[in-house]
């Protein structure tokens, strides 16, 4: 039961996350719930140790350690302390004109400070920097998903079929010339087909990317059309992948030169939702978890490289009509620059942008910020190791009135981070789409500014001086894990272990803590958690206690020995529909729907029919779940046997004909 400290009132709609090794069968080893109107919640999980996270609007985040046993339920009355008013950053909503459809897909600023936005209904609107008045600059575009403004009278928009230059030639504030800048890619009209971007470097070159189409109809086609690339798995089986590069250059990142030349740069991308160019003119792209993409990712894109999803290789001159094997893909694949673990680090990351505000946004100069389809903005701190980028990801702002669908961002001349928000109809937003901005109040946040690799561990640098007790090793916990690279839709964590801290110390600068770990291994994601309530020497609490460092490489001089840390196997428990509910929501509900009646568009069946799939025995259904069928991917290598049994138990209990919902 959740109650507010002080008045004892129940806390409703709090987000709760239970995480631990006993939930290895669940994505990211965690279950999620919301508290009811009376503040009550319940988790049913196997015996073992767990971390319980409680996140509620207006209250301080809370993490508890819970030990579950077989014969004794754990009952807790939990008091939540009211959160202090955010002292460092606040979220504000930008007023939009009533006649605008607020499905805002991109934002940018012109050199004169005008705010420029597109919506997915094909409009471009501009808010003047001087008077703050909105005007509709252009309309009739096809799902504009990116915008840049080279001048106060010219706007470039990436719509699905082309990049369009919009020019106001007579000074009346409305575009009267629409010019095609580039259209050198294929399209099919598939409902799941997107053109992502738009980013511009200092030389005026433009950058973007194309997502895969989904299985289904291709009502019309521009350019060549090709079937999915067949990649046999190591066991010789031919897998199914509903996301395919059927039109030319789907799954690619591209550049358009200033003269309009279209240049495909690199492939291996599934849904490159976020495209950004750094202050050094380097291209970074985020990708969304799915087949061949184990979790959300950030890539540093280099021409000619391959990033994981093989279907776009069919458009590469060296791979046209050439057989591709799984072993070839493993050797070619460039690992992600940064892994963004699903859950605490969002679900579908958006456009990366860099703090170049000259101190107007706080202490994070030069660092990267990424929005997400959830109400989260992440921060990324990169470093180069052996000439290759890798680094740490942190939660930056979560909640605080932030809306969902914030997948395109831009820093304004006022130093605020502006966020375009739309979810394109995938889910209810309760009227929350539009534009918001994150504003620095001028108060310095207490945060982990840098998380950097060392030869024997890591160094954490805080934004403010910290007391001597900050150097104690029992303030911190470190875990490491990996993901599978496979065709299945996402991946669970694997090889997950706690990494003991051998020693720690606070440097004389009072801001940097050195953590020496028992051992260092490359090719792992290291999870850092501050488990003590740290505060600065001024008494201000730490804002974000979690970070994830992607250690593709280690520093020269690091001693790497065979590991002595072994992940423990999890025992198979009896099938539990309560555990299966969470698995269904995370892995199945998008296609099979909350009511279990499926979708004709996607091709999923109706579980509630007396003659539907649930009329078949468990053995048949488990075989289908494991191996996949029609549009459904094989989950046998994504979810352990425990999860398969649990989700089937949930589906039978909830959607069986005897319990069919109206």
Question: What is each model feature region?
Answer:
Residues 9-10, 21-44:
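Short, acidic Ser/Thr/Gly-rich low-complexity loop/linker segments typical of extracellular
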Residues 51-66, 81:
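A short, solvent-exposed loop/turn motif at the edges and junctions
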Residues 83-445, 449-457:
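Beta-propeller domains with acidic blade repeats across secreted/periplasmic ectodomains
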Residues 409, 435, 580-594, 647, ...:
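The canonical Cys-X-X-Cys-His
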Residues 442-447, 467, 531-573:
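Acidic, Ser/Thr/Gly/Pro-rich low-complexity segments and short DxT(G/T)-type signature motifs
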Residues 463-503, 529-536, 545-549:
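Short, surface-exposed alpha-helix to beta-strand junction/turn motifs within ectodomains of secreted
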Residues 578-581, 593-624:
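Gly/Gly-Pro-rich "capping" loops immediately C-terminal to redox-active cysteine motifs
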Residues 600-606, 624-662:
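Axial heme c-ligation environment in periplasmic c-type cytochrome domains
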